[in-house]
């Protein structure tokens, strides 16, 4: 582990402790022997035959643990000796506490408490002096009152301590005098500083001017994810919440969702109004059994009514289809797929999700996006032999199938309605209700065993003996199990250190008889023979003598599975090309001999051959532990071992995400990996917390003296190799956890009688066992506290264990009196617990100000600035973690009730090393003294070989990433707050740019660290050995978060200023032809120059916001590299699929069009020549759903907002030409706050010049006519009247649709009506119904031939606004429709209006003579007219890729169509009663 220099002075506590240690050593002889925790315990009385046993000196050593381990002389200096300092392990120098020093320790605690109080008073006085020196009285009021209230948080407690601990008026007066002196000195220093600060007065005044600004984070960064089965709240720290506070992302999503609606309308018009020559059933009934009885009682499972809405049937000239795999004779009358209006909803027996494995028919170039019914077109079915499976969902089929036929075994087809004999090259699979996702597959070098027990059905009840017999087949051989356990405790144990190593190994010996191979070897109790007979010795019997052994067996299975997944050879191969060399860190293989490397390679190759299947864990937790019942119903069998298993289970679910679907029944529709963002972990952690409360873990074990009385009975049970009959006088909770520790202590004592159990264990060993049990108790509790903090940080949810010290007095594991000389790695674990808890306190301080509603509603800028500065000092190593926590408490940013007053014996030298020292440890391979001196070669030779040092440094690496992610989040919040204020207050521009640059620096830091991790996981003996599974998701999540900010900056760099609500249009209608040749040539030159610079770009350097035009290209190159990384990681990790889709989504969207338009073809060649309709499997399903599905997407909800169906606003007067319907006239919807116009921090003069040139070229191209809408004048509007909407059709014309209306007047393409004109009178963004449209019931072409003829000649977008059930005659609809300034749809029925029958498409009037089958709507024109977003030209082909296409809602849950945004396609359960009950928010 790397050490960093700390310029910390030796505290007074250490000097007092040192003087205490220097007392006469004769004081030891009168103390109680053994490591007793009580000072008044009786001395040890020897038995009558004690003279025959050699007496041992029961004293506590004075030398430090490290010197005793190295067997060198210790000078006993405090806080660390010189020997440890010279060898570079001063941070591990540890002294066991003396029993006679307990009273002195209490005095030290009092003095330390007084010292902390003095520091707080000093900080308060300093703050008050600054307030009084402020020239503004307003700032005094606004600053003094809230600050004092925060600073004195918990002051009553400290005041009581002061009164209790001083004890005399003289000490209080003395302290008062010291405070006065310190105050005078500080005033003099402040006066001298003020004289030297005149040069920086301007910058300081700007900073001080906005210090008291309040931010309301409860509205800007909160999301509510509405799902089909409930709602989930996502706080400000969730990865989805970043877009809510950014106006650019809001408007971009609004544009994307609006485009998605328009593109669906285009597809609808293309397919709905073509003549259907034939409507044949796609199933060939000729192959069905011609049984008369069957024909009379059974029907075809295809819903033929679907063809009436535009579905094209197979043509007659198509080749003969294959035999239908559906056996129609097996369908009863109740198996027909239900219509939408049927009351009894019986699901279709065909499992459509199975088509993703190769049975999906190829899609047409223009599928019908509004078709939600399942069609089976066997003419286009392509069976993939290696992947084809039975398409029947047996769970839905067996529910409605007759029991007499289901139980029949004579006819194989009676069990499954599929005639498998007709499925060519497809093997029938046995029916199983256990659908699993393939978990991590072994790499090329691994050969997993195929267990027959994996193929058996697990849905039926299994007895305990059957489960144990099955597990014996699944578990690896004994020697392999021992190797896995050793690997776990060597590499993975520091990540979840809640076990007692010796205790756990002893349990495994009892259950699996591992020591029977050779009981005369290492501390595990078994040898590692190379003989093949011993190597392949299987597990023949599993002994479960106690009830808790089932939990120990479950922990073992998790350890076997997790360690196998973490083997470096099993990690994903990452090849980023030339950029890979930039992210490599030095490894430590040079420190190992060739023989050691060879031995390690042999062990890994042996372990790779023995994979423990995930089904073994399912069997254990379901039938042996019955964890579902324990965690939800009863706590009768809850003990420490149960809590340990629950923690391991939670840890495994988060780490091995590909196994998650096998273990849980979570509905993961629309989420790539529910294991990290779903509510399942929240429920499990709450259960773990309640079980910990039930076991009393929140109270320190020293409060329960009855723990000492259970050891003799426990040891007797263990020595007898215990049956399940426990001593009724003992505590069963302790029996299950302390027994093995006692036995292990007996085996280490060297006494044969103790090992055999014939004599009771002596008191010293009992005391050691008690202390180890208490130590495990404390470790479990503080690990739960850390889990709570991490979950709150990941999901943005409130913490469960708030104000920890108000209900818990459990001490840190460092308070345990254990001799670590035999277990140095446990000493490192103890040090890490203290350090990580202090880091968690820093994270808690941030979470309180962001997530707590009482603080987040009015958090002030200077509070966030203080958090930023302290976190920067911590991660850059300029301040020790103890000092950072003390500063947080003194400044009122962290209440003492959160646990700020940690134990007084914290090691100031054991802190968080610098990130550079962690990464470069293998290269320099040297440490520094505490005073900064380099170590010599002789000191390096004497350095102690520390266990799992690389794992500890990897954990330090993850802590740095977490802290810097918080710094990025805080800077991003302040940036999005001050950037829109620049147009009104220019002084905020400096602040906004500073915060943006800081946010970008920390985002790039997280991006680099993510790349460093994945580029080094497969290196031998690297920093991340065996940590590839545990740290993969945290690192990838931080990299994904940083890319979100990259998207924000690219939008600003490409779009320029937002035009706001009172100027020109936000979303313009420029096309590709709007660019003149000179501007495009200049763009090409700039792009070529930027590409040359990118070739020399160093990904390890920070990006400057002043990079100008190359900023977007630099950031885009990083997005492309991250997309390449996630694509490779998707092969192994499911959660990488979501991130790959997210990155690919924005890469496709933000790419600049690379092809110039052809003026001869009218711009139609703007599309790529080889463009084809993208495959449905590549679409983003959250954009392919219908409107009801999108309303459940949190991004959609926050980008557009919820409103009533008619889009009426509460309190707004009815405008001319607008009619209000029903209750919407009195019931308003939720509207988003208005967005003000402002210039982004990336705005430069070159952006202005290029935008002006673009605007001029666009103005030259336009042709004005009577239908043109002047954006600068709301009065120049054609006259018209408002048609009466009917059947839910809003009278408000949707945004982005007027271009198709204006195409009716001569084919010209004017600009889109200004968003300002639509919303200026309402003061808000356009509502949901103004941007999207309700689904329209279009007329049947067979009913009205004349109407169909007119529709054929309309543009595809125009016909989207015609309603079949309207009461207005079609002749009255043949008028000019436009949008006025109020957003009202107007119809001109004057004589000058042109009729629909005479309208032409943009391609000319010659299309009117074409037939319906020959006419094809012009998709390219449509895309070009909608590819401009605020000056950002979006590639039309990319636009189709990200918003086009249509996914069947039944396929949204497939693995290959997983989305990066959550969306559901089922109604919200429990809210059906509120439908249309004046609750527009649920509409």
Swiss-Prot record:
**Additional notes on this entry:** Heme is an effector molecule for CYP1/HAP1. The repeat region (see FT table) mediates heme induction by masking the DNA-binding domain in the absence of inducer.
Region Disordered, annotated ranges: 1-56, 162-208, 432-458, 706-767, 1266-1289, 1386-1411
Q: Which residues form a coiled coil?
A: 105-134
Indicate the residues that the entry says bind DNA. 64-93
**Keywords for this protein:** Activator, Coiled coil, DNA-binding, Heme, Iron, Metal-binding, Nucleus, Repeat, Transcription, Transcription regulation, Zinc
Q: Self-association or partners: how does it assemble? A: Binds DNA as a homodimer. Interacts with SRO9 and YDJ1. In the absence of heme, binds to at least four cellular proteins, including YDJ1 and SRO9, forming a high-molecular-weight complex (HMC) which results in repression of its activity and dictates its DNA-binding specificity.
Q: Which PANTHER family match?
A: HEME-RESPONSIVE ZINC FINGER TRANSCRIPTION FACTOR HAP1 (PTHR31944:SF131)
This chain's protein is named Heme-responsive zinc finger transcription factor HAP1
Instruction: List the InterPro entries.
Output: bZIP_sf (IPR046347), Fungal_TF_Env_Response (IPR051430), Transcription_factor_dom_fun (IPR007219), Zn2-C6_fun-type_DNA-bd_sf (IPR036864), Zn2Cys6_DnaBD (IPR001138)
Q: Report the GO molecular function annotations.
A: DNA-binding transcription activator activity, RNA polymerase II-specific; RNA polymerase II cis-regulatory region sequence-specific DNA binding; zinc ion binding
Write out the biased-composition intervals (Low complexity): 177-208, 735-759
Main localization is: nucleus
Give me the HRM repeat coordinates as residue ranges. Answer: 280-285, 299-304, 323-328, 347-352, 389-394, 415-420, 1192-1197
The compartments listed are: Nucleus
Compositionally biased intervals (Polar residues): 1-50, 162-176, 432-447, 706-734, 1388-1411
Residues that, per the record, bind Zn(2+) 1: 64, 67, 74, 81
Organism field: Saccharomyces cerevisiae (strain JAY291)
């Amino acid at each position: 582990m790397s050490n960093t220099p700390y310029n910390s002075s030796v505290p007074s506590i250490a000097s007092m402790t040192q003087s205490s240690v220097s007392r006469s050593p004769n004081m030891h002889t009168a103390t109680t022997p053994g490591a007793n925790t009580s000072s008044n315990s009786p001395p040890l009385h020897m038995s009558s035959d004690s003279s025959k046993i050699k007496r041992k000196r029961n004293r506590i050593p004075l030398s430090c643990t490290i010197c005793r381990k190295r067997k060198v002389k210790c000078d006993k200096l405090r806080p660390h000796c010189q020997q440890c300092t010279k060898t570079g392990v001063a941070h591990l120098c540890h002294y066991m506490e003396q029993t006679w020093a307990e009273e002195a320790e209490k005095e030290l605690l009092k003095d330390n408490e007084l010292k902390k109080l003095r520091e707080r008073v000093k900080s308060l006085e300093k703050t008050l002096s600054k307030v009084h020196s402020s020239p503004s009285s307003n700032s005094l009021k606004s600053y003094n009152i809230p600050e004092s209230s925060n600073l004195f948080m918990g002051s009553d407690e400290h005041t009581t301590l002061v009164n209790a601990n001083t004890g005399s008026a003289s000490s209080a007066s003395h302290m008062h005098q010291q405070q006065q002196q310190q105050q005078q000195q500080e005033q003099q220093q402040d006066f001298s500083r003020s004289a030297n600060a005149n040069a920086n007065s301007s910058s300081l005044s700007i900073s001080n001017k906005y210090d008291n600004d309040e931010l309301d984070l409860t509205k800007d960064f909160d999301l509510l994810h509405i799902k089909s089965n409930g709602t989930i709240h996502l706080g400000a720290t969730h990865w989805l919440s970043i877009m809510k506070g950014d106006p650019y992302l809001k408007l971009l999503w609004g544009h994307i969702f609006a485009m998605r609606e328009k593109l669906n309308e285009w597809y609808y018009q293309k397919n709905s109004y073509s003549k259907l020559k034939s409507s044949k059933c796609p199933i060939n009934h000729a192959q069905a059994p011609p049984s008369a009885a069957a024909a009379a009682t059974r029907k075809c499972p295809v819903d033929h009514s679907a063809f009436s809405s535009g579905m094209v049937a197979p043509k007659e000239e198509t080749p003969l289809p294959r035999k239908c795999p559906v056996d129609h004779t097996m369908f009863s009358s109740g198996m027909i797929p239900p219509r939408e209006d049927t009351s009894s909803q019986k699901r279709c027996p065909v499992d459509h999700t199975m088509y993703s494995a190769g049975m999906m028919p190829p899609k047409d170039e223009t599928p019908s996006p509004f078709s939600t019914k399942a069609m089976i077109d066997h003419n286009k079915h392509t069976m993939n032999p290696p992947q084809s499976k039975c398409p029947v969902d047996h769970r839905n089929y067996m529910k409605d199938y007759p029991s007499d036929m289901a139980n029949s075994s004579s006819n194989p087809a009676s069990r499954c309605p599929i005639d498998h004999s007709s499925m060519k090259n497809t093997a029938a699979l046995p029916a199983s209700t256990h659908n699993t996702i393939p978990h991590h597959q072994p790499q090329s070098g691994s050969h997993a065993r195929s267990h027959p027990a994996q193929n058996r059905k697990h849905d039926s009840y299994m007895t305990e003996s059957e489960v144990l017999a099955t597990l014996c087949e699944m578990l690896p051989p004994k020697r392999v199990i021992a190797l896995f356990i050793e690997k776990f405790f060597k590499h993975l144990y520091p990540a979840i250190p809640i076990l007692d190593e010796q205790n756990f190994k002893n349990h495994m010996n009892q259950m699996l008889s591992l020591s029977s191979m050779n009981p005369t070897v290492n501390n595990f109790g078994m040898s590692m023979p190379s003989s093949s007979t011993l190597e392949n010795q299987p597990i023949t019997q599993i002994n479960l003598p106690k009830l808790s052994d089932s939990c120990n067996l479950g922990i073992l299975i998790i350890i076997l599975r997790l360690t196998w997944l973490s083997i470096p050879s099993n990690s994903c191969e990452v090849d980023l090309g030339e950029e890979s060399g930039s992210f490599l860190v030095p490894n430590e293989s040079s420190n190992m001999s060739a023989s050691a490397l060879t031995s390690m390679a042999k062990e890994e190759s042996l372990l790779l051959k023995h994979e423990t299947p995930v089904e073994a864990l399912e069997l254990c937790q379901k039938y042996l532990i019955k964890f579902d019942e324990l965690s939800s119903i009863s706590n009768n069998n809850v003990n420490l071992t149960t809590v340990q298993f629950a923690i391991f289970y939670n840890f495994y679910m988060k780490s091995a995400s590909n196994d998650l679907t096998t273990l849980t029944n979570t509905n993961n529709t629309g989420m790539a990996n529910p294991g990290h963002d779903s509510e399942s972990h929240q429920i499990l952690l709450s259960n773990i917390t309640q079980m910990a409360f039930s076991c009393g873990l929140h109270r320190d074990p020293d409060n329960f003296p009855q723990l000492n009385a259970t050891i003799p009975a426990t040891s007797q049970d263990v020595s007898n190799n215990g049956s399940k009959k426990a001593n009724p006088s003992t505590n069963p909770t302790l029996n299950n956890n302390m027994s093995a520790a006692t036995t292990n202590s007996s085996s280490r004592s060297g006494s044969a009688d103790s090992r055999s159990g014939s004599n009771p264990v002596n008191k010293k060993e009992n005391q050691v066992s008690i202390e180890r049990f208490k130590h495990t108790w404390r470790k479990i509790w503080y690990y739960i506290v850390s889990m709570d903090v991490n979950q709150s940080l990941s999901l943005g949810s409130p913490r469960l264990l708030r104000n920890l010290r108000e209900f818990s007095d459990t001490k840190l594991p460092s308070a345990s009196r254990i001799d670590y000389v035999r277990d140095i790695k446990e000493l490192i674990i103890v040090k890490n617990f203290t350090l990580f808890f202090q880091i968690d306190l820093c994270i808690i301080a941030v979470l309180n100000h962001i997530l707590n509603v009482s603080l987040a509603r009015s958090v002030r800028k200077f509070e966030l600035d203080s958090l930023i500065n302290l976190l920067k000092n911590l991660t850059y190593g300029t301040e020790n973690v103890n000092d950072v926590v003390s500063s947080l408490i003194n400044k009122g940013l962290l209440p003492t009730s959160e646990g700020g007053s940690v134990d007084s014996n914290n090691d100031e030298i054991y802190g968080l090393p610098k990130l550079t020292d962690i990464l470069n440890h293998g290269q320099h391979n040297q440490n520094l003294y505490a005073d900064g001196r380099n170590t010599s070669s002789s000191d390096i030779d004497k350095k102690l070989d520390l266990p799992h040092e690389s794992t500890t440094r990897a954990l330090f690496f993850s802590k740095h990433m977490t802290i810097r992610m918080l710094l990025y989040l805080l800077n991003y919040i302040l940036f999005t707050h001050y950037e829109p204020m620049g147009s009104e207050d220019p002084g905020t521009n400096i602040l906004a740019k500073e915060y943006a640059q800081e946010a970008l620096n920390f985002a790039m830091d997280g991006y680099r660290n993510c790349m460093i991790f994945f580029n080094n996981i497969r290196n031998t003996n690297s920093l991340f050995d065996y940590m590839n599974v545990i740290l993969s998701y945290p690192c990838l999540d931080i990299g994904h978060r940083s890319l979100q900010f990259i998207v924000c900056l690219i939008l600003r760099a490409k779009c320029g200023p937002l035009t706001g609500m009172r100027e020109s249009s936000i979303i313009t209608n420029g096309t590709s032809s709007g660019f003149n040749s000179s501007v495009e040539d200049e763009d090409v030159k700039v792009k070529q120059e930027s590409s040359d610079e990118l070739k020399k770009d160093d990904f390890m350097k920070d990006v400057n916001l002043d990079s100008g035009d190359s900023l977007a290209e630099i950031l885009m190159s990083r997005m492309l590299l991250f997309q390449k990384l996630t694509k490779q990681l998707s092969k192994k990790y499911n959660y990488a699929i979501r991130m790959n889709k997210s990155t690919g989504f924005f890469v496709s969207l933000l790419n600049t069009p690379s092809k110039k338009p052809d003026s001869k073809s009218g711009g139609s060649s703007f599309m790529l020549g080889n463009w084809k309709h993208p495959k449905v499997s590549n679409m983003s399903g959250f954009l392919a759903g219908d409107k009801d599905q999108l309303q459940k997407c949190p991004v959609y909800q926050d980008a557009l907002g919820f409103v009533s169906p008619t889009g009426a606003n509460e309190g707004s007067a009815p405008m001319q030409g607008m009619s209000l319907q029903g209750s919407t006239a009195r019931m308003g919807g939720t509207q988003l706050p208005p967005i003000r116009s402002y210039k982004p921090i990336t705005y430069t003069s070159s952006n202005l010049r290029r935008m002006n040139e673009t605007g001029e070229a666009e103005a030259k191209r336009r042709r004005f006519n009577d239908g043109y809408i002047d954006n600068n004048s709301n009065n120049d509007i054609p006259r018209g009247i408002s048609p009466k909407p009917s059947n839910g059709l809003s009278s408000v014309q949707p945004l982005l649709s007027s271009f198709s209306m204006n195409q009716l007047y001569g084919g010209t393409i004017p600009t889109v009506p200004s968003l300002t004109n639509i919303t200026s009178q309402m003061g808000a963004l356009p509502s949901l119904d103004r941007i999207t449209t309700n689904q329209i019931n279009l007329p049947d072409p067979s009913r009205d031939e004349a109407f169909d003829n007119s529709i054929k000649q309309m543009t595809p977008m125009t016909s989207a606004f015609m309603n079949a059930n309207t009461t207005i005659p079609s002749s009255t609809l043949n008028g000019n429709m436009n949008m006025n300034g109020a957003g009202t749809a107007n119809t001109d029925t004057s004589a000058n209006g042109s009729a629909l029958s005479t309208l032409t498409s943009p391609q000319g009037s010659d299309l009117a003579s074409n037939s319906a089958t020959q006419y094809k709507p012009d998709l390219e024109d449509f895309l070009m007219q909608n590819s401009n977003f605020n000056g950002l030209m979006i590639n039309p082909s990319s636009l189709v890729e990200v918003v086009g296409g249509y996914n069947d809602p039944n396929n949204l849950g497939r693995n290959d169509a997983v989305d990066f945004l959550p969306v559901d396609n089922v109604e919200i359960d429990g809210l059906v009663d509120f439908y249309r009950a004046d609750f527009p928010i649920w509409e």
